[in-house]
Amino acid sequence: MIETFNFQGISDRVAASYLQAHGSITWHQIKAQIGRDPACSLLRSYWAYEDCRYDKTRQACSHPRYLRGCPVPSHPLRNGRLNQTAFSFFLFVRDVAGSDLFRWLDDQLAAAADLGNSAAQEALVGPMRHVFGVSDKVLTMTLSAVLMADRRGRPDWFDVGSRMIVVDRLVHNLLVRTGILAGFDATHGYGQHCYGQAGCADILRRVSAKIDARQFDAGFPANFPRYIQHALWHYCAADGLNVCNGNNIDDRKSCEQISCIVYSICGRNALKIK
């Protein structure tokens, strides 16, 4: 999961290239470095680790007297925030999940089993929301991948993960440009509204329920919101099909890409009002 956290705030291609060149960070590395009684009080527990403010460029933090011997800067991650995220997540798993993340996931899902899929998702994302430097979007994306990794062995995990939807700016903008948000009378700016009632995620779930995903792969579940959302992202992303994005469309004008497969039925709404 820590490696996946690197894929935020930058293109996937750049993030992957950096990881390949410099490597990531592992549980065992952090465990060996923190030890039983770290000099910096912030590293003593998950709840104490806040306001670290480690800055890779300036080589500074909120407790400079301990910086030279601190393990946080010792890993060559892309920026200091990612170093903080790695240690914050380690402390979460150690102190909140009892060093057994899979068992914690099982327990959280079991506690929410009778409350519906949304409650199950919140049972996982909610407690992790306070891990430093990770947004709901990144948590949802990462947890979805983990939960869907073993469909045969953990079908209950797969059911929750397959219904997790990640709304990034590309997907939101596609729903604006195509006129889908306007068609649902759900126009809103990118952000938390995307996950609210009649927001992007809600609309994608409604759309997914009408698409039998088994037509794309017989092994898929009939209703597969995560796949539908990812397909839309892939259509837009520069690292994907690179069609519906600001590289190819002037945000102030209607789309002019007549080669787009949905051009004839697209609302072609300008993203920005002049």
Model feature map: region roles:
Residues 1-274:
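HhH-family (HhH-GPD) DNA N-glycosylase catalytic core used in base-excision repair
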